[in-house]
């Protein structure tokens, strides 16, 4: 068969030979492009605002599963098997309201849903942030801060000085109880943006999510403190 294929191409012009190659191998290309890789991801969900009536499909052919969200903690753990993006839908309208593309290297994810503002009339309602939630990235006894506040923040975590970058900051070891005080500069004035205390039990870790102020013009950021034990249920 290989000799016959070479003879066919040799007897044609260069341009025709290229067309013949495309025709011969096109079915393989189409099949490769139409079959995206399946991923297996375990994940939890947190919404920056109260949300209900959300579902997702764990696997092709299965019924939609409701997502149970907590106001101050990660949701229960769910599992997804399929191609990306992972889609979250409205239970009533069945429309897709959030999408998450989880990188291949992440198998334990935290999905943070932040409502789009202003709220769109149709289409996606949330911006979705995907975080590596594995114990490898953040071990017990540490605090990570996700700065989505829109401010440049600096201050102290316990007795350690810190300056936060935008996005997810590296985890830092903390004592069982650590005060967190963060400030920002507005019009040459240093203003307190956040103050709180993180208290951990043995084997726990914390993620502090900082969001833009609720009131326009305020320097006080909104916050969500999420405490859990890696690989186990969350603590409300």
Region roles according to the model:
Residues 32-236:
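Intrinsically disordered, low-complexity polar regions and short flexible loop motifs
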Residues 13-27:
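Bacterial N-terminal signal peptides
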